[in-house]
C-alpha cells in the first residue's frame, strides 16, 4: 500500500531558466525516490500559458506553485529548491499538526518576500550591466584625455623652441609668427577633441583618408629637428618611391611618428643614429620600422610599455623612461586595424614596428577600421 501523500505542483519557468542549477536540482529531486510524496509536476512556459501569471498573481519567474493540497503556496527566486526542502517535512506532518491545532499555512509576507527578492536580483543584474557599460565609457574617455594631454605637449614645446630660436637670432619674426600660428591651430583642434569627450568615443574622432606616409614622417622629422641636431644624431630613411598611399587619419598618424621618433632620439646616445624604413608588406598593409641604438628594453617589459597607465622606470642614465606616448601609439594603430610591437635587445637597441592599411578606395562609412 502506498502511504505517500499526493502533491500537485506547477513550475512556471522560461526555457533558459530550466537549465539553472537550482531548477535542475529541484526537478531531479522531485523525480527521485528521496521525495516522500506522490508528485504531480507540471512544467509551464509563461509565453505559452500567460494566463498562469495572472491566475496565480506571479510577479517573478521561475516560480513553483503548490496547487494541492490546499492552501496554495508559491516559491520564487533563485533558491526555490532550498525553500521547498524546508516545507516538505512540514507538509508531511500536516495531518498531525492540524489535530494539534497548529496552522502551517504559509505566511503571505514570506511568499511576497521571496518574489521581491527575485525582482531585486533582476534589478541588481541590470544595475551591474549598466555599471559595466559606464565604466567602459569612462575608461574610453580617460584614454582620450590622456592622449590629448600628451599631444598638447608637442605644439607647446615647438612654440617654446621657436621663441628661443628667435631670441638667439636663428629665425626672424615672420618665421616665428608662422610657427606660432601653426601650433595654435593644432591646439585648437585638440581642444575640439576635449569638448567631445563627454559625448563621443575617442575612436569616433578619427578621420581616415588617403595619405602619404613619406610626407608624414618627413614632417615629424623636421618638427623634431632641434632635438636630434642638438645631439648630432643622424636620421636615415629608407622609403620606396613606389610605396602606396595608406588609409589613415593624418593627425593621428603624425602623432605616432612624433612619439616613436622622439623616443628613439631620447634613448639614443649623442652622435648615434636612427633608421626609419617602410615596406609594402602585403597587398593590404604597409609596415613601418623605427630603430635606435639605445640601451634596449628588457624582454619582460616589452609588452607592458604599450599598456595604459604604465610608465617604466628610466632605462639608461639621463632618460625618464617610456611613458604614455606608447600607449597612445597602440590605441591609434589599433583603431586603424593595424598592430604595433617592439623587437629589442639590451645594449643593442630597439626597433618599433607598426602596420597601416593600404588605401584601396575605401572610406570611413565602409567600417574598414576596427577597434583596438
UniProtKB/Swiss-Prot annotation:
Every Histidine kinase domain range: 147-360
Enzyme Commission designation: 2.7.13.3
Matches recorded under CDD domains: HATPase, HisKA
Protein name according to UniProt: Adaptive-response sensory kinase SasA
Top-level taxon: Bacteria
GO biological process: circadian rhythm; osmosensory signaling via phosphorelay pathway
Transmembrane annotation, as ranges: none
Record HAMAP family: Kinase_SasA (MF_01837)
Taxonomic source organism: Prochlorococcus marinus (strain MIT 9312)
NCBIfam families cross-referenced by the UniProt entry: PRK09303.1
Name of the gene encoding the protein in the UniProt record: sasA
Post-translational modification Phosphohistidine, affected residues: 150
Pfam families: HATPase_c, HisKA, KaiB
Reactions the enzyme catalyzes: ATP + protein L-histidine = ADP + protein N-phospho-L-histidine
Gene3D superfamilies for this protein: 1.10.287.130, Glutaredoxin, Histidine kinase-like ATPase, C-terminal domain
